[in-house]
């Protein structure tokens, strides 16, 4: 068996206590980040389930008239400003509707953003305003970055990720000597303290690469603005614009406020056909433009096959003549220009298809367990007579708050799925009501859990509640949309079917787990 050299006692104690303190401080927020992020991975796959209007026959993106989409949007939005940045997302099997993001003039000096959904078969435009009609998966995604907290939320998520990286390294150094022994000695039998300790070390070692990816990319995304200045100072003589241009080629394109309008120039259809012909193996995922209709306007086409880590590209064409201004060719990009896209792919698991997302999801759930086992190790180690009753009660309260916050996320996520079906799709301000049901439901579940002093009872209750709610998800979808689980399978609506089936499977599994495995263990709190 491999023998690893241990740290010196003093250094080991420093690393151990640093790992413990940093882990306890960030565990509340970090669990939310990973749990919400695990579901946010499937935003595209959830789209048809949460939006019944998107359950239509998929139209080949190459057969869509994108210039006609622009004209149809202009009819619905007469004040649409084409000189501002606007874009179109072509239809896919996951998202059969075409997205349109644009701006319209409020007055001479003010514009407001809007979102529209276009049926690529009929070119019917459904206006969603500033917020899309369905927001369920995006709410979960925003929770991953704490976007619900104004201004500082994204920075908070970045700081948590940074300290997570710190906790990873201190934990690795702390358990370095015992990693091999604990890994091979792992068992689900024996005392809970030993199970928690062995699994914390073993699973932490197995998921180490995954955790490093998320700690690094999460910190970079959350603290990107704070990292911009030192990067500009060290590598670009203080010029922040040069940093942005090195990473994002489109930022290097300059536009004039005095540009004149021109007619009959390069169009969206022209750009789509040109890129498709030159890159047939790379689907077009987004088309956007700046100063469209003006002599210095541009049209940018982004491609990505969703399989390779560097299999994305970007092509910028001049609106006036269709000449290529910039070309970021897939698999052939420079290091600086591909760095940001690689980080994005690593974080969102968009480089290996659905199977990779499932692996990411499982690893995220394992990471959530690692955090919980760490908290239980911390609490068990302090439930001794060497600590005063006051200290032990404090440790118990911290543990109970952690378990109530984290374990209640299971039924809370089921609640937002149910709310997405219960709240009428055409109700004005629908997003507000769905989100309110989710967060208020989560808050009620959390507060309820604080009254359960027994940890195993708390976990058991949340699993039962969450499992029952999961079983209601396919029922709600069938009742409110008419697309029952068996009908979606027959109609080959596989994305809708997979969500209902997964919810049903989780619900049944949770109830079986509760019946045959989970037992309420009497744990002394002081």
Task: Identify what each model region corresponds to.
Residues 186-192, 381-398, 523-526:
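Membrane-interfacial, low-structure loops and terminal tails that flank and connect transmembrane helices
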Residues 169-182, 363-385:
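Membrane-water interface of transmembrane alpha-helices
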Residues 154-169, 352-369:
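Alpha-helical transmembrane segments
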Residues 215-261, 389-522:
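Alpha-helical transmembrane segments forming the membrane-embedded cores
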Residues 2-46, 152-239:
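Internal alpha-helical transmembrane segments
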Residues 40, 44-88, 238-298, 307-310, ...:
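Membrane-proximal low-complexity regions enriched in glycine and acidic/polar residues
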Residues 3-9, 29-35, 39-145:
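Juxtamembrane extramembrane loops of integral membrane proteins
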Residues 104-145, 169, 306-345, 368-376:
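Extended, hydrophilic extramembrane loops/domains of integral membrane proteins
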């Amino acid at each position: 068996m491999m023998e690893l050299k241990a740290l010196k006692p003093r250094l080991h104690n420093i690393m151990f206590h640093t790992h413990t303190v940093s882990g306890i401080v960030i565990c509340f927020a970090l669990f939310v980040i990973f749990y919400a992020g695990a579901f946010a991975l499937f935003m595209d796959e959830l789209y048809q389930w949460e939006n019944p209007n998107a359950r239509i026959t998929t139209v080949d993106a190459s057969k869509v008239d994108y210039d006609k989409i622009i004209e149809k949007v202009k009819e619905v939005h007469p004040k649409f400003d084409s000189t501002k940045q606007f874009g179109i997302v072509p239809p896919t099997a996951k998202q059969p509707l075409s997205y349109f993001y644009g701006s319209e003039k409020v007055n001479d000096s003010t514009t407001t953003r809007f979102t529209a959904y276009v049926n690529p078969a009929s070119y019917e435009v459904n206006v969603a305003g500033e917020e899309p009609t369905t927001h369920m998966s995006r709410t979960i995604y925003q929770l991953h970055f704490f976007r619900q907290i104004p201004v500082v939320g994204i920075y908070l998520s970045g700081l948590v990720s940074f300290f997570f990286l710190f906790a990873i390294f201190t934990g690795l150094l702390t358990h370095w000597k015992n990693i091999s022994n604990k890994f091979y000695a792992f068992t689900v039998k024996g005392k809970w303290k030993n199970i928690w300790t062995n699994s914390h070390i073993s699973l932490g070692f197995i998921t180490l690469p995954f955790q490093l990816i998320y700690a690094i990319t999460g910190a970079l995304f959350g603290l990107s603005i704070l990292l911009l200045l030192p990067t500009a100072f060290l590598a670009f003589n203080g010029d922040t614009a040069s940093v942005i241009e090195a990473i994002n080629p489109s930022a290097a394109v300059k536009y004039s406020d005095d540009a004149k309008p021109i007619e009959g120039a390069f169009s969206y259809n022209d750009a789509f056909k040109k890129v498709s012909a030159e890159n047939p193996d790379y689907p077009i995922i987004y088309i956007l433009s700046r100063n469209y209709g003006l002599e210095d306007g541009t049209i940018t086409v982004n491609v990505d096959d969703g399989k390779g880590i560097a299999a994305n590209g970007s092509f910028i064409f001049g609106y006036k003549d269709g000449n290529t201004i910039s070309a970021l060719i897939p698999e052939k990009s420079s290091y600086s220009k591909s760095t940001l896209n690689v980080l994005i792919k690593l974080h969102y698991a968009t480089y290996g298809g659905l199977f990779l997302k499932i692996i990411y999801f499982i690893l995220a759930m394992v990471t959530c367990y690692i955090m919980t086992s760490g908290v239980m190790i911390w609490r068990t180690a302090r439930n001794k007579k060497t600590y005063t009753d006051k200290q032990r009660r404090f440790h118990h309260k911290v543990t109970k708050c952690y378990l109530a916050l984290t374990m209640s996320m299971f039924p809370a996520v089921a609640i937002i799925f149910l709310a997405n079906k219960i709240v009428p799709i055409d109700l004005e301000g629908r997003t507000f009501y769905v989100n309110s049901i989710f967060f208020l439901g989560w808050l009620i579940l959390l507060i309820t859990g604080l009254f359960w002093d027994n940890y195993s009872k708390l976990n058991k209750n949340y699993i039962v509640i969450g499992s029952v709610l999961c079983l209601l998800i396919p029922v709600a979808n069938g009742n409110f949309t008419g697309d029952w689980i068996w009908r979606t399978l027959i109609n080959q609506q596989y994305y809708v079917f997979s969500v209902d089936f997964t919810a049903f499977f989780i619900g049944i599994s949770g109830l079986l787990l509760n019946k045959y495995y989970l037992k309420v263990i009497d744990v002394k709190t002081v």
